[in-house]
Design a protein with these regions (language model features):
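Structured segments of extracytoplasmic/periplasmic soluble domains
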Residues: 85-92, 133, 170-181
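Acidic helix-start/capping segments at beta-turn-to-alpha-helix junctions
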Residues: 99-110, 147, 187-196
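Extracellular serine-dependent O-acyl
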Residues: 96-104, 119-152, 176, 181
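Serine-dependent acyl-ester chemistry module
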Residues: 5-81, 108-116
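Charged, often glycine-rich, active-site loop that binds/positions anionic groups
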Residues: 111-120, 153-161
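Histidine-centered active-site loop/cap adjacent to the catalytic His
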Residues: 156-185
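Residue-level detector of conserved catalytic or cofactor/ligand-binding positions
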Residues: 207-212
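Extracytoplasmic/secreted proteins, especially bacterial periplasmic and envelope-associated proteins
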Residues: 77, 81-84, 125-129, 165-169, ...
Length: 212
């Protein structure tokens, strides 16, 4: 949460203090978390399927819609930045040592979990633009690999990240494509570092409806 900003002549005249103070008031509103949690619980109880750009999906998934992420001006600009970076990598290290990969969000891969009539942006359209912009032979389609392994949990239910197991299968597929021998999944040891973190999407909704 935002902390009380320090006032200075520079921050006051630039408007930064006012902006930071407004953020501070929003974050430090009394019982803020309780109000957000109650609001989300009421919305879910009244059969709302979405709140704050988050879908209440099947199997207790909280899935971000990312409704504006791919239509913002920065979305196309980022393709250009990545294109330039990859061209430099290919020129410097060679095509065989440069791979571009963008992992799709849960809202794209787990469409079968979304509420009825949900209509998120089609990320595949954007990812195809990214793929087309990359130097030949450098794009790796992680989405296809993930769709082949939908029998496992690919994304955390209450966070936007993919699971470690999902990342493993993409790594293994990439390694095989490059002619490398990937380590077996059994070669890794799973270790739980904490059971008290439910993720960023859970923090936005504060409803705590499921296990990660």
């Amino acid at each position: 949460l935002a902390q009380m900003p320090e006032a200075s002549v520079e921050s006051c005249f630039s408007g930064k203090f006012e902006k930071d103070f407004e953020t501070y008031l929003t974050d430090q509103f009394p019982m803020r978390d309780g109000w957000i949690s109650a609001k989300t619980a009421i919305e879910k109880a009244t059969f709302k399927t979405e709140s704050k750009d988050i879908y209440f999906a099947d199997d207790d998934y909280l899935i971000e819609a990312h409704s504006k992420s791919f239509t913002a001006p920065s979305a196309n600009a980022n393709i250009g930045y990545l294109k330039n970076f990859m061209e430099t990598c290919v020129e410097t290290y060679g095509k065989d040592h440069a791979t571009a990969m963008v992992v799709p969000n849960a809202v794209d891969i787990l469409r079968d979990h979304l509420p009825k009539y949900a209509s998120p942006y089609d990320e595949e359209v954007y990812l195809q633009k990214v793929a087309d912009a990359m130097p030949e032979g450098t794009w790796f389609d992680s989405g296809s690999v993930l769709r082949e392994h939908k029998d496992i949990q690919l994304y955390y239910r209450t966070d936007h990240h993919w699971t470690t197991e999902a990342a493993y299968y993409v790594y293994a597929a990439w390694a095989e494509e490059k002619g490398l021998s990937p380590l077996a999944l059994s070669d890794y040891k799973k270790k739980t570092l904490t059971d008290g973190f439910f993720g960023t999407v859970d923090a936005l909704s504060l409803i705590h409806i499921s296990e990660p």
